[in-house]
């Protein structure tokens, strides 16, 4: 799935190294069998150069929260064009809209759902404005401690490895 978007992963004994093409694209993906992970790809959609369609996710409306509507509501704070149906979402990223819209950190609601906190934290770790300033604020980020107590420590470790060129 991520290879189709333009990301190549190399696996070794020391870990996983990702190689991202200069033009990371969206696509059309069925998440029915891996529905818990749709939030991560959807949250990363502002990084894409082309539209992203995710379907097979209607049953996620009945989890900790209505994950489809919740994701759409949060993405509308970042992306100009997001469509929702019973079973899908479609996101049309626009980097220019996104960068113009940020004059203070965008607040992301987690709905006390760990997957929202973790998915948007990954997006927030990117320095999209190129000024090394926070541009995303996650409300109740620690709701993820019930499933991944060291998530933010691990994310910070991964970022440190990238920033140091390792």
Protein language model features and the residues they cover:
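Short, structured segments at the rim of ligand-binding sites
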Residues: 1-166
């Amino acid at each position: 799935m991520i290879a189709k978007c333009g990301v190549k992963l190399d696996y070794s004994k020391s870990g996983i190294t990702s190689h991202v093409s200069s033009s990371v694209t969206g696509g059309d993906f069925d998440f029915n069998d891996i529905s818990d992970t749709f939030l991560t790809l959807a949250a990363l959609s502002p990084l894409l150069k082309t539209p992203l369609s995710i379907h097979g996710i209607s049953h996620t409306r009945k989890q900790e929260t209505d994950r489809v509507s919740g994701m759409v509501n949060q993405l509308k704070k970042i992306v100009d064009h997001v469509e929702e149906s019973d079973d899908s979402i479609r996101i049309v990223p626009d980097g220019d809209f996104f960068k113009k819209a940020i004059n203070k950190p965008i607040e992301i609601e987690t709905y006390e759902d760990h997957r929202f906190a973790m998915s948007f934290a990954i997006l927030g770790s990117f320095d999209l404005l190129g000024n090394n300033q926070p541009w995303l604020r996650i409300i109740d980020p620690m709701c993820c401690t019930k499933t991944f107590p060291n998530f933010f420590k691990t994310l910070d470790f991964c970022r440190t490895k990238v920033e140091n060129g390792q």
